[in-house]
Structures are given as C-alpha cells and as structure tokens.
Amino acid sequence: MANACKKKRLLKSVMMPAAVCAAVIGLSALGFAAEGGEGAHHVDTGKQMKDFMWRVIDFAALLGVIIWALKKANAKGALADRTANIEKALREAEEARAAAEKKFAEYSGKLEKANLEIDDIYAAIRKEAELEKERIIAEAKLTADKIREQAAATASQEVLKAKAELRGEAARLAVQMAEQSLRENIKKDDQDRLVNDYLTKVENLH
C-alpha cells in the first residue's frame, strides 16, 4: 500500500513538468508557424534564423529544466524510499530490541527461579544429611549400649558359672579329703561294725 502511494506521487510529479513542456513546445510551434505564414509576404531570413536559434535555446533550457525536475523527482522518490527503508529498519530494530529484552527478562526470571529451587534443594539435602547423621549416631549409641549390656550379662553368667564350677570342685575335693581322712582314721574293727550296722538297717527296711 505504501509503495503504491509512493509510485502514484512520483508519477504525478513527473507528469506535471512533462505537461508543461508539451504545452510550451506546442505554443512555440504555433508561434513559429504563424510567423512563417507572415514571412511569405515579407521575407526576412536573418531574423527568422535568429528567432529560430532563440527558440532552440529556449527549448534546450526548458528541456534541461524538465530533465532536472525529473531527476529531482526521482531523487525525492529514492530519498523517500530510503527514508522508508530506514524507518522500517529502525522499527524492526526496535521490535527486535523489545523482543530481546522480553526474552532476557523471561530467561532472567527462569534463572532466578532455578537458583531459588537449587537453594531449596541444597537446604533440603543439608537438612536430610543432618537428620541422617543424627539417626546414624543414635543407632550407633543404641547398638553400643546393647553390646555393653550383652557383654555385662555374658560376663555375669560366666562369673556365676565359674563360681559354680569352683564350688563343685571344692565340694568334690572336700569329699575326697573326707574320705581319705576317714580311711586313715577308721580301723578294721570300726569298718566291720559299720558294715554290719548298714546291713542290719537294710534288712530292717525289707
């Protein structure tokens, strides 16, 4: 739409000087023809040539003006096109800058959000590590207490067992020593008497 308007303005600026030029040439031709008709009655060749030369000069000057006007019109059109292109490029650059700033703000927000999430994750990991550390320490203490209790119970049982064994051994040794002492102290008559008493008691039981 903008290019069509520019072309229309350019065509209008060219047509106006061309129309003026055509009108001037037409008037010059008519004047020259009229003078030529009058010259048939009273011929003045020198004056006609001089007038013709001036008309040629006028025509050349007019043609130069027309060419200058056309070039100026083309220059204005080219300048307008260049201005439009520059304005378009500036608009596109501004739009690109706005889009880049929008993207930058968007990515900055995402980066900030990601940093916050990373901080939260790091804090959660540290908290979980502290809880795990405390749990491991508590389990280690509980295990150590159980081991100490088991060791104490085992030691106590071993002590009781050793005491029982020592008592049994002491009783056995005491019996052996008593038997030996009796053997040494009891005479043959006492042995026979003890045997007879034992047999009598057995018979009485039956």
Curated annotation (Swiss-Prot):
Q: Where in the cell is it found?
A: Cell inner membrane
Against Pfam families, the record matches this protein to: ATP-synt_B
Keyword Signal (UniProt) = no
Q: Which GO terms describe its molecular function?
A: proton-transporting ATP synthase activity, rotational mechanism
**InterPro entries given for it?**
ATP_synth_b/b'su_bac/chlpt (IPR002146)
Membrane association type? Single-pass membrane protein
List all membrane-crossing ranges.
14-34
What does the UniProt keyword field contain?
ATP synthesis, Cell inner membrane, Cell membrane, CF(0), Hydrogen ion transport, Ion transport, Membrane, Transmembrane, Transmembrane helix, Transport
> Record's GO cellular component, any one?
proton-transporting ATP synthase complex
Chain's role: F(1)F(0) ATP synthase produces ATP from ADP in the presence of a proton or sodium gradient. F-type ATPases consist of two structural domains, F(1) containing the extramembraneous catalytic core and F(0) containing the membrane proton channel, linked together by a central stalk and a peripheral stalk. During catalysis, ATP synthesis in the catalytic domain of F(1) is coupled via a rotary mechanism of the central stalk subunits to proton translocation.
Entry-linked HAMAP family:
ATP_synth_b_bprime
Return the similarity comment.
Belongs to the ATPase B chain family.
Give the multimer and partner information: F-type ATPases have 2 components, F(1) - the catalytic core - and F(0) - the membrane proton channel. F(1) has five subunits: alpha(3), beta(3), gamma(1), delta(1), epsilon(1). F(0) has three main subunits: a(1), b(2) and c(10-14). The alpha and beta chains form an alternating ring which encloses part of the gamma chain. F(1) is attached to F(0) by a central stalk formed by the gamma and epsilon chains, while a peripheral stalk is formed by the delta and b chains.
Q: How is this protein named in the record?
A: ATP synthase subunit b
The species is Geobacter metallireducens (strain ATCC 53774 / DSM 7210 / GS-15)
The gene name reads: atpF
